[in-house]
Every structure is written in C-alpha cells, then in structure tokens.
Amino acid sequence: VQESVAKAFCALGNYLDAKSEFFDPDEIDEIEKKHLNFAMKNTNVVDAFNQARTALFYRIRGQHRHARTQRMIRYYFAAQDIHERANSTYFDYRQIAEQLKNTDLIFRIQRLLELQAQACHDITACLRQNTPYHYNIRVEKALMGTIQSLELYSKEHAEQNNVLLALQTLIDNLKSINWQLRQLEQETSENDQTAQIHTEQITGLKNILSVIGSNFTFESPLFRHAIRLS
C-alpha cells in the first residue's frame, strides 16, 4: 500500500513538472508539443491513483483501521486534491505565456510549480524510506513571491480582465497545493480520523448516524471524494 501511494506522488511530481514547462517564456513555440507530454503525465497520475485506491480498499476491507493505513489514506486524499487543483485551471497557455514573457511573474509561476513537483518527489522518497516528510520553506517563499508579483502585474495591467482572472485562479489553486503539502507535515491523529474510506461494519443506529454526520461536511475528504465521483 505504501509503495502504491509513493508511486502516486511520483507520478504527481512528474505531472507538476510537465505543467511548469508551459511557463517557459523561451519555448512558447513548443507549447503544442508540450500538451501531448502533459496529457501522458496526467494519464500516468490517474493510473497510479487507481492502483493506490485499489490497494487501500483491499487493505482495509473488513478490518479495523490501522494507524499506518490511515496515514496512507490521508496521503492519498492529499495527492488527489493536489491533482484536482493543478488540473482545474483551463486557459490558453500560449496566450498567457505571450502576455507574461517579459515579466518575472511567468518565471515565478514556473519556479513554484517546480518546487511543488519536487515536494511530491520528496514525499515519494520519504514513503519509500519510511522517514518523516518535512515541508520545505522554499515552497512557501516561492508562493509569497508569486502572489506579490501577481499583485504588481495586476496594477500595471488592470485592463487585462480575462488574463488576470485566469492568473488569479491559477495562483489560488497553487496556494491550495501548498496548504496540502504543509498539512502532510503537520499530520495528526485527528486529521487521520477525518480520512475515512474504510468498509468496516458499523452497528447501531446511533453509531451509523454519528459516522454519517461526521463526514457530511466539506472538511471531510470522503465527502469531497464523493462529490468528485458524482
């Protein structure tokens, strides 16, 4: 199970690296070719997630929750949310790159994505070596620099409404990715308790209602996963 989750984060890191290549101002003419590579990396992520999810379900079927399994569930949901955030911004990469090619903002976005990709690879290594993951403060500094750069660009190009909206959405999603990476370091037993995809038998009406109620919130990874499936 742990190896399957490690592979999921490895695929996710490769995916974020591929996304960062869209923000290279010196290779704008190569963007169409990069779309194919990006699509392949996305397919690899989906396949890795499916394998990790299957491994988790087999591990917990009919069993009480184990601390290590719960930890892997938390990591799985974090990886899924990171992928969702990174994949939810749709815009013309060529147009954005052309607009930003003479600014530092495009370099900052690329650098932030590269650091987030590296964080995913770091998580992969930690899972395989069974060592604690530590959030790299450089990722947070890169995010703060990107936000400040966007604020400056927005003031100087207030007329570019569509571009600014797309950029703000992108930065918001990258901010959410950073949050997930921080949370993995700050993981607690309370966080584990919220990540429930187990199939253990629950008896008694009171207990059933309690379990349902505890997951019927947007703070519950299980609830967000159900929305994605729907």
Where are each of the predicted segments found?
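Cytosolic regulatory and coupling regions of membrane transport/channel systems
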Residues: 2-230
